[in-house]
């Protein structure tokens, strides 16, 4: 199976299982970084970059469907307006317009995205939908002043070669993800991550104006920690166990499971840092990790099941067919109830906040 993340957006629509209603975990991390990114914009961005044309352009890469992307856009706009007001004299304020590019895969539910965006005059910007993989350029050269992406770059452009090949040393047998248990599998995923991150950074370097900022927020593993040791890794492995149980019940087949692996890789922080430093197009203005804001708070089984369902439904339906998702996540909820996650014992992923400046 050659699985490309380009084909599998978050759950669409507006029902109880859609991403629009199950993205509060991501929102908490994004919100926790607002003050840091605001400070970087104030200290590192030269507003003269937009003075020639009177339009300030922002892009959210991998926007999915609201509301997180709209909060991001408005937060950046509010910060730029405050900085501009602070730096301008009474008679020097020239009207500045804002344009926001919402980018995601062509299969993203752009209809729901734009139906749920704030209406004018509350919305202070002109909206543009940009379908296309961010693993490559999606916008003209030197066109963006601030780029943003959050909870996206753990999605690879495709499943690494040989991971679903039974004859390969990198065959991900018995697992549906790179949980760092199998060395050859981890190597294959890391190679793909390195390729994709290079392409991502090179594309953003072309799209950003010199002096423009790129904000990157997401989760990674602390150095020395493997994904299977975290609660997120445990949930993903449990989903794999549920699929195997369903194969034994005849609902799906072991053959389909053997040919299934997610195009997802959570790097260790040093891996992520190394790839960014290796790219010569940016200076690093901020690179920090913190614990997730919800760490230490009780996450219910319903919350966990709904969160994972929102980002896995499309890819699971595509590979295993209709009628599998409801049963799969019913079984997941049951397993989590019978075998509760020991959050205290599990190692933690960390949230990273990175701000890069285009040279």
From Swiss-Prot:
InterPro entries reported for this sequence: MeTrfase_7, MeTrfase_capping, SAM-dependent_MTases_sf
UniProt cross-references to SUPFAM superfamilies, sorted A to Z: S-adenosyl-L-methionine-dependent methyltransferases (SSF53335)
Residues engaged in binding Mg(2+): 172, 258, 260
Chain residues that bind S-adenosyl-L-homocysteine: 19, 63, 68, 104, 133-134
GO biological process, one term: methylation
EC number from the UniProt entry: 2.1.1.-
GO molecular function, one term: methyltransferase activity
UniProt keyword Methyltransferase present: yes
Necessary cofactors: Mg(2+)
Domain of life: Eukaryota
Pfam families: Methyltransf_7
Description of how the protein assembles with itself and partners: Homodimer.
Sequence similarity: Belongs to the methyltransferase superfamily. Type-7 methyltransferase family.
This protein's name: Probable S-adenosylmethionine-dependent methyltransferase At5g38100
Species name: Arabidopsis thaliana
